[in-house]
Amino acid sequence: MKKSLVLAGAMLACVAAAAQSTPANPPGTPQDGYESAHSLEMYREGNATMFMNDFGQLRRYHDADAAMGAPTPGEPRVIFFGDSITDIWKLDESFPGKHYINRGIGGQTTPQMLVRFRPDVIDLKPAVVVILAGTNDIAGNTGPETLEQIESDYASLADLARANGIRVVFSSVMPINYDSGPNALKFFLQRSPDKILALDVWLKKYCADHGLVYLDYFSAMADERGLLKRGLSEDGLHPNAAGFAVMAPLAQAAIEKALAGPAAQ
């Protein structure tokens, strides 16, 4: 708890420092949150048709799901499920020979993930699902959400998985940075660092209370300020090759811990 409070203080101090050190209205810089809010509104408007016609984006993996056979005996199936960070992760390079399945979709929030959890996870009969989400909920990609609403969605994902005998690994929400590229400040202002920390604290406790595995990317990827370490991302949000190199062994250890634990009930 003491470490969490120190991180929270450091992260909030960085928000203030970013605001104070930013020149008055330089090109491409959000001013009083206007440009950040404007870009989010543009994202929502640009995806309005998709939201109306296929909110969960069920078509994305429909054919791949239909072609997926039963798990190979003796090889527990593992699915990585989440948003763009999962979507861009080249699992075959990070986990050679493991045949892990990627079911990430860029930009998604937990309400969307709930819609597609059955076809993209449950029906594929994995032994383990590794879920990485939350950052787009905090940003408000599909509309404003309270922490309580996000937490409720996480709990629903866990309930669905466990009811179908699937072991759950909940990943921490990733740290972010505001000075790692032209889009970094926009991403930073859309994603409250204190909400990221609060959600991670809740996730860790929820996993402990319900017998799930907590995958702590945050501690390994945050610097002394509580922000994403330089060199692990090109835009302050999405990991690059170096970032995924940090994440892969942590994910593998979490998967092995989940498989070694009791069967989901």
Predicted regions, residues:
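N-terminal secretory targeting modules
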Residues: M1-I79, D87, L91, L124, ...
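Alpha-helix capping/helix-boundary segments
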Residues: I85-T86, L203
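Conserved beta-strand elements of the Class I
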Residues: I79-F81, I101
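Short, solvent-exposed loop/turn elements at domain surfaces
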Residues: T86-D92, T109-Q112
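Short hydrophobic segments within beta-strands
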Residues: F81-G82, S171
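Active-site metal-binding loops of divalent metal-dependent hydrolases
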Residues: S84, I105, T135-N136
